[in-house]
Amino acid sequence: MEAIILVGGLGKRLRSVVSELPKPMAPIDNKPFLHYIFWYLNKQGIDQVILSTGYKHEMIETYFGNRYHGISINYSIEQEPLGTGGAIKKAFRKTTEENVVIINGDTLFLVDLRKMFERHISFKADLTLALKPMKEFERYGTVITRDSRVIAFKEKGYHSEGNINGGVYIANKAIFECESLSEKFSFEQDFLEKEFLQKKFYGFISDAYFIDIGIPDDYRKAQKELQHYI
């Protein structure tokens, strides 16, 4: 299997604790957060990764090189910010498989990718989203499904419970080859939340371990927790 990891963001909210590093290079137990994503992908049978880089991409390339944890690495470099959607579209030009895993570089969600891939294929989905059940939260929006089909997205705000977008996807390459797609766009706002009615988007619910290091509090939480899951 093949995966795209989005590691090109500026990580502004984490600057107060990791000022000189790209967010996926934030250290946890003397290793960058991205190391743990590679560990996870290796366990899930991923053998090829495209790192979608931007901010301080040389630092990432120097550390990970062309092979890491038994996974071959190729690079898709943003010379200017393209948004998450533009970054994915550009990275897809370097992929070789029809269906590809996409992962946010600041999130670790230990979902069973093999089962998720089977579900994606069985539904003949355009896109499958890994969804994490949560209770009492306001940092995330929620994804509503009916018979696994995505039927709505609800905005961020207080939710007593719901399924959040866990930042792990399996996408059919064809949906990013559409000529109408801009070279710069947000994957979440401009694509997911606008295309789910026209395209076949499905949810894959998993209560596996999830951590998002996008803010200082959760980065500190990851430093305490990750050792128990790796």
Swiss-Prot record:
UniProt pathway: Nucleotide-sugar biosynthesis; GDP-D-glycero-alpha-D-manno-heptose biosynthesis; GDP-D-glycero-alpha-D-manno-heptose from D-glycero-alpha-D-manno-heptose 7-phosphate: step 3/3; Cell surface structure biogenesis; S-layer biogenesis
GO terms (BP aspect): biosynthetic process; S-layer organization
Keywords: Carbohydrate metabolism, GTP-binding, Nucleotide-binding, Nucleotidyltransferase, Transferase
Reaction catalysed by this enzyme: D-glycero-alpha-D-manno-heptose 1-phosphate + GTP + H(+) = GDP-D-glycero-alpha-D-manno-heptose + diphosphate
E.C. number(s) listed in UniProt: 2.7.7.71
Any GO MF annotation of the entry: nucleotidyltransferase activity
Annotated family: Belongs to the D-alpha-D-heptose-1-P guanylyltransferase family.
Task performed by this protein: Catalyzes the GDP transfer from GTP to D-glycero-alpha-D-manno-heptose 1-phosphate, yielding GDP-D-alpha-D-heptose. Cannot use ATP, CTP, dTTP or UTP as substrate.
Name under which the protein is recorded: D-glycero-alpha-D-manno-heptose 1-phosphate guanylyltransferase
Gene field: hddC
